């Protein structure tokens, strides 16, 4: 008998067939409980406080020295790690997308799967290992999230570029995000599913991916993003495992014009306009090179699939030395300029001054070289001083010349290099800070003085806030205004619940509910009546010489309504309210930027703008995760908002009470009542009615969002807590706490 057969452990904890295997469509509440204290080595650690004790200039000095400290185990191209570190920072921040605010550099996710093993991130494992001695030296005073971004900034500065600034404040997490939807493809570099196609194919990394099939995709010159290439929302990359576009062209087709369309869509979904996009590409490709020294079959598995002996590194390369001049990363072998470690405008000069012809890299990937052998010998080799090359370009580079919108922008930057430098500095700063939220979160000595529109600026707060007596007076006036509890609660929710924990945007501060585009959103139908009444109260109060912002008043109105509803249910006590919010102007509000915050569905108000293929309860879960809610908070808020009458348009769906406007646990008691039998009332199973089992009388009507709290085992267990005979007090306490949390999600000035 072998030793192995004697082992008492044939399987270990966490293995075997899981619930998700049996029921893949099951609501996944785990996304509400990520990054808990159990995963953190120091749950009480205050990163902002630690960062403020950092010797920032000493850190930058060490980073600058690292740039030219080439290591034998991973030699620096051209003797300078700057381009590698720019790519590292870019690929950390570049996962951000505006559709849901997820991705980005804000928590150091590049360290974890899947990002650490994306095909587009080959060799960035080495970049982070090069940084480890510096991270080790400065410890918890600098997070990986901040260090990755700062290193990219220092890399630019070390090569002669003047950056716009840097702000810290990105705290690390200690496990992979589970809430980010990266696509449904099951193979790396697959791209069919996100474009609604019927088949997924893949090639090895570095050799392109899908080859366009005219019968399925249409002729390349006739493709249109609104039709054949309509990228699934909220995705901002054309293939699984890429940051943006396929550099060889759409699906490996080397068509610069078609590539331009992909670039515009993907960069736009990362909040970049056409000028910013051109500046980022032209600025970023002023430095460094790509790597495709040999065939991709020389490259081993990614970090997550590599053996223990690799110690978290991946993509072991058996071609030649496997490093230096033998490096294989993207499979493309391109060096754009003769000054790859110094800022210049040569990228655009080469792009426009040469005519280009299609060729292939040693790995077989499509790329471009100057026609007629021009430019030969002008570009240095990255590792052999005895070799010289011609400049080369990617298909995505040529898009800047041949796309009819990008071309005049790129040509203007070619002729005005100072304007390119300014545009690149600003676009780079936006790239690496877009997911940081309001300026109250920014830390460090290099924060720019200039306020930028994409930062959703707010006026400075008046240090003299309203007093407790003022708050009591305003509450009385609000409750005497004739507005219902439901109207007040729904309006406060509409204002505060735009917050996204992903990119820290939205929320009640600023009172942008009264401004375009929020005032015109379908979800906010009816709030104009409430806002008009509150503005009248504000005007009367402010005429006395004191000042209250409408932002504060909107939240206070909801707070007063919750207090009244609790009192009417027989519970005493107050709901916490902390003033200090300000009112933004329309000039401080980028309509296009805020448009992505519009709720297309808000289960908390039983609202859907249209019919969607995604089930309503999954849209609710997504909203709850963006609001940073736990499963108990989600549950208690739904139950409370329903009985308060906060539904959109006064809908009766889910209002399982005969005393709306009273903060009772009726929603849970009546949902779990076994004398009621539920049946769908619509063919799509979106609405239901509950009938008395004996009489057949209709008692209640509800949506999928309502019924999931009795159907889903975990949510039902939570609902039972609040439906119990001793659950009333806990229900009110928990609702009040969750309500105040949502109302203050954007109050980083208090944290």
From Swiss-Prot:
| Record protein name field | Catalase-peroxidase
Matches recorded under InterPro entries: Catalase_peroxidase, Haem_peroxidase, Haem_peroxidase_sf, Peroxidases_AS, Peroxidases_heam-ligand_BS
Q: Where is this cross-link: Tryptophyl-tyrosyl-methioninium (Trp-Tyr) (with M-270)?
A: 90-244
UniProt modification remark: Formation of the three residue Trp-Tyr-Met cross-link is important for the catalase, but not the peroxidase activity of the enzyme.
Q: Where is this site: Transition state stabilizer?
A: 87
Q: Name one GO cellular component term.
A: cytosol
- Cofactor needs: heme b
Alphabetical UniProt keywords: Heme, Hydrogen peroxide, Iron, Metal-binding, Oxidoreductase, Peroxidase
Residues spanning the membrane: none
Any single biological process term in GO: hydrogen peroxide catabolic process
List the GO molecular function terms. catalase activity; heme binding; metal ion binding
Q: Which gene encodes it?
A: katG
Sites binding heme b sit at 285
Position of the Tryptophyl-tyrosyl-methioninium (Tyr-Met) (with W-90) cross-link = 244-270
| Oligomeric form and interacting partners | Homodimer or homotetramer.
Q: Which organism is it from?
A: Pseudomonas putida (strain ATCC 47054 / DSM 6125 / CFBP 8728 / NCIMB 11950 / KT2440)
Q: What does this protein do?
A: Bifunctional enzyme with both catalase and broad-spectrum peroxidase activity.
> What EC identifiers does the entry list?
1.11.1.21
* Catalytic residues (positions): 91
State the reactions this protein catalyses.
H2O2 + AH2 = A + 2 H2O; 2 H2O2 = O2 + 2 H2O
């Amino acid at each position: 008998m072998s030793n192995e057969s004697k082992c008492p452990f044939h399987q270990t904890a966490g293995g075997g067939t899981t619930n998700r295997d049996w029921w893949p469509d099951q609501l996944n509440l785990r996304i509400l409980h990520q990054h808990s204290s159990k995963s953190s080595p120091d749950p009480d650690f205050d990163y902002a406080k630690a960062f403020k004790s950092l010797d920032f200039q000493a850190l930058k000095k060490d980073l600058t020295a690292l740039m030219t400290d080439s290591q034998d185990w991973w030699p620096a191209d051209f003797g300078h790690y700057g381009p590698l570190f720019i790519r590292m920072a870019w690929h950390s921040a570049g996962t951000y997308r505006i559709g849901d605010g997820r991705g980005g550099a804000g928590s150091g996710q590049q360290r974890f799967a899947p990002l650490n093993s994306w095909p587009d991130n080959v060799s960035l494992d080495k970049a982070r290992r090069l940084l480890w001695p510096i991270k080790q030296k400065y410890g918890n005073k600098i997070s990986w999230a901040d260090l990755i971004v700062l290193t990219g900034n220092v890399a630019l500065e070390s090569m002669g570029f003047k950056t716009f600034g840097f702000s810290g404040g990105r705290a690390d997490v200690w496990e992979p995000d589970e809430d980010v939807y990266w696509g449904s493809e099951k193979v790396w570099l697959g791209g069919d599913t996100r474009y609604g196609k019927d088949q997924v194919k893949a090639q090895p990394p570095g050799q392109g991916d899908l080859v366009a099939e005219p019968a399925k995709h249409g002729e390349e010159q006739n493709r249109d993003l609104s039709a054949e290439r309509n990228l699934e929302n909220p995705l901002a990359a054309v293939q699984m495992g890429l940051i943006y576009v396929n550099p060889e062209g759409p699906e490996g087709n080397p068509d610069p014009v078609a590539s331009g369309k992909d670039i515009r869509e993907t960069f736009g979904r990362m909040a970049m306009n056409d000028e910013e996009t051109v500046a980022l590409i032209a600025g970023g490709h002023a430095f460094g090179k790509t790597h495709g020294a040999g065939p991709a079959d020389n490259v081993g598995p990614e970090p997550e699939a590599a053996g223990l002996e690799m110690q978290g590194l991946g993509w072991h390369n058996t071609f030649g030395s496997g490093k230096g001049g033998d490096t294989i990363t993207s499979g493309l072998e391109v060096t754009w300029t003769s000054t790859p470690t110094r800022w210049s405008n040569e990228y655009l000069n080469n792009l426009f001054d040469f005519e280009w012809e299609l060729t292939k890299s040693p790995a077989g990937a499509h790329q471009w070289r100057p026609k007629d052998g021009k430019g030969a010998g002008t570009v240095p080799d990255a590792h052999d001083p005895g070799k010289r090359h011609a400049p080369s370009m990617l298909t995505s580079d040529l898009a800047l010349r041949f796309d009819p919108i990008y071309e005049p922008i790129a040509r203007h930057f070619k002729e005005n290099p100072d304007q390119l430098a300014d545009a690149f500095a600003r676009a780079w700063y936006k790239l690496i800070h877009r997911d940081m939220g309001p300026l109250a979160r920014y830390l460090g000595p290099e924060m720019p003085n200039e306020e930028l529109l994409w930062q959703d600026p707010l006026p400075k707060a008046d240090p003299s806030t309203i007093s407790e007596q003022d708050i009591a007076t305003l509450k009385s006036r609000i409750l005497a205004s004739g507005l219902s509890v439901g109207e007040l609660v729904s309006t406060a929710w509409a204002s505060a619940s735009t917050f996204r924990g992903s990119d820290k945007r939205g929320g009640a501060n600023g009172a942008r509910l009264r401004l375009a585009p929020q005032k015109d959103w379908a979800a906010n139908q009816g709030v104009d009546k409430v806002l008009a009444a509150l503005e009248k109260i504000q005007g009367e109060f402010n005429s006395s010489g004191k000042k209250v912002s409408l932002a504060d008043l909107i939240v206070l109105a909801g707070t007063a309504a919750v207090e009244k509803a609790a009192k009417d249910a027989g519970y005493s006590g107050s709901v916490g309210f902390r003033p200090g919010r300000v009112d933004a102007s329309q000039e401080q509000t980028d309509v296009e930027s805020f448009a992505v915050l519009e709720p297309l569905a808000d289960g908390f108000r039983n609202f859907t703008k249209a019919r969607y293929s995604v089930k309503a309860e999954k849209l609710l879960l997504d909203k709850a995760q963006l609001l940073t809610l736990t499963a108990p908070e989600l549950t208690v808020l739904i139950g409370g908002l329903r009985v308060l009458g906060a539904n959109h348009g006064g809908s009766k769906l889910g209002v399982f009470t005969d005393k709306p406007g009273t903060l009772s646990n009726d929603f849970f008691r009546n949902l779990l009542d076994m004398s009621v039998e539920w049946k769908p009332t619509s063919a799509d199973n979106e609405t239901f009615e509950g009938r008395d089992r004996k009489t057949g009388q209709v008692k209640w009507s509800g949506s999928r969002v309502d019924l999931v709290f009795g159907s889903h085992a975990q949510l039902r267990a939570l609902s039972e807590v609040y439906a119990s005979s001793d659950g009333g007090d806990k229900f009110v306490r928990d609702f009040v706490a969750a309500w105040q949390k949502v109302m203050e999600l954007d109050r980083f000035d208090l944290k």
